[in-house]
């Protein structure tokens, strides 16, 4: 089921990305998708939009008043409501961001540290990851005291684990196998 949702979201995102390129509105549409994603995650908004008793024109008008969203983006919401796919808005937004980053040579990295990293440390990490990947890096930070020290960086499907907890596990394995 998740693969199917992803495939559907990917098709919508690709179509939106192409249309946004034609309209020269890549950043505006990214912002609109993020806003719509946040809006549709609100239970009351989702309930309103999913209510079949409320006509589409009314839903469209309410959304238009709620935010400064491109009319073509409102058409997307209308289509998702009509096909009962509003629940994939977040996936569409995420996939659109991925396509936009890919086109710009940017990659997201989730960097987890034992305690919050300073801005200077984050910048050093960004530079090092940029050297490794050859791309610009957006860093999303997280903390996990279980790492003890060091960091883990997830870039796409790759994981760089430079944490002390990982080194301790490796050392424990070496000892248990009699190598040390």
Curated annotation (Swiss-Prot):
F(1)F(0) ATP synthase produces ATP from ADP in the presence of a proton or sodium gradient. F-type ATPases consist of two structural domains, F(1) containing the extramembraneous catalytic core and F(0) containing the membrane proton channel, linked together by a central stalk and a peripheral stalk. During catalysis, ATP synthesis in the catalytic domain of F(1) is coupled via a rotary mechanism of the central stalk subunits to proton translocation. GO terms for molecular function: proton-transporting ATP synthase activity, rotational mechanism. It is found in: Cell membrane. Transmembrane segments: none annotated. The keyword Heme does not apply. InterPro entries: ATP_synth_OSCP/delta_N_sf (IPR026015), ATPase_OSCP/dsu (IPR000711). F-type ATPases have 2 components, F(1) - the catalytic core - and F(0) - the membrane proton channel. F(1) has five subunits: alpha(3), beta(3), gamma(1), delta(1), epsilon(1). F(0) has three main subunits: a(1), b(2) and c(10-14). The alpha and beta chains form an alternating ring which encloses part of the gamma chain. F(1) is attached to F(0) by a central stalk formed by the gamma and epsilon chains, while a peripheral stalk is formed by the delta and b chains. Disulfide bonds: none annotated. Keywords: ATP synthesis, Cell membrane, CF(1), Hydrogen ion transport, Ion transport, Membrane, Transport. HAMAP family: ATP_synth_delta_bact (MF_01416). It is a peripheral membrane protein. It comes from the Bacteria. This is ATP synthase subunit delta. Coiled coil: none annotated. Belongs to the ATPase delta chain family. GO terms for cellular component: plasma membrane; proton-transporting ATP synthase complex.
């Amino acid at each position: 089921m998740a693969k199917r949702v992803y495939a559907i979201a990917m098709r919508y995102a690709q179509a939106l990305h192409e249309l946004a390129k034609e309209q020269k509105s890549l950043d505006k549409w990214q912002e609109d998708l993020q806003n719509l994603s946040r809006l549709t995650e609100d239970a009351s908004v989702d309930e309103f939009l999913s209510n079949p008793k409320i006509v589409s024109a009314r839903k469209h008008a309410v959304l238009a008043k709620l935010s400064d969203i491109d009319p073509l983006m409102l058409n997307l919401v209308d289509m998702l409501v009509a096909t009962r796919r509003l629940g994939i808005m977040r996936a569409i937004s995420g996939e659109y961001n991925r396509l936009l980053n890919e086109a710009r040579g940017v990659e997201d990295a989730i960097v987890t540290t034992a305690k919050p990293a300073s801005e200077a440390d984050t910048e050093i990490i960004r530079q090092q990851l940029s050297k490794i990947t050859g791309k610009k890096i957006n860093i999303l930070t997280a903390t996990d005291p279980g790492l003890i020290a060091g960091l883990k960086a997830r870039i796409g499907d790759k994981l760089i684990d430079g944490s002390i907890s990982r080194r301790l596990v490796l050392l424990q394995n070496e000892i248990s196998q009699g190598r040390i």
